Amino acid sequence: MKTKNIMIVGVGGQGTLLTSRVLGGIIQEAGYDVKLSEVHGMAQRGGSVVTFVRYGEKVYEPIVEEGQADVLIAFEKLEAMRYAHFLKKDGVLIVNDQRMDPMTVVTGAMKYPENILETLSERFKVVSVDAMAEAKKLGNARVFNTIIIGVAAKSMDFPKEQWLEVIEKTVPPKTIDINKKAFLTGYSI
């Protein structure tokens, strides 16, 4: 099997690290070699968080090079735009249709770009989901990242039941049920 590359990007506190642990868990249970790497900017202050997940028969390096990501999972539209250059030409971008204004926009120093999803759709296959709205329907906005995991799971070759088992092992015990519901919501989108 050729090495597969996944990037997860978001803003501090959005659950990118949990998402990478779930992905790493499912891949490892399937018997592949997996490497995870995290880059924290000013994450605690709403800055970018990037995680890399690489897997295959044998993986030596945890970092995904520009233009090599098979899948880019973005928890926010601007983060999708910021890291889209990591995607392969035939890569898939899974993006949460959410806007979080960075400090430069809040202070008025810059404007938030318009038509991000349309621009990205010109270059890549884009799967857009309003995971926050779906999470609010479930009564817990914090599980929007698990909804995105469900969306991403459809493009990977691992059984749904195995995903649910890994989620159960990974999330805090008191959140298992809501996270399973969130995953199934994303999986059905």
What are the residue ranges of the model-derived segments?
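Active-site cofactor/cluster-binding pocket
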Residues: M1-I189
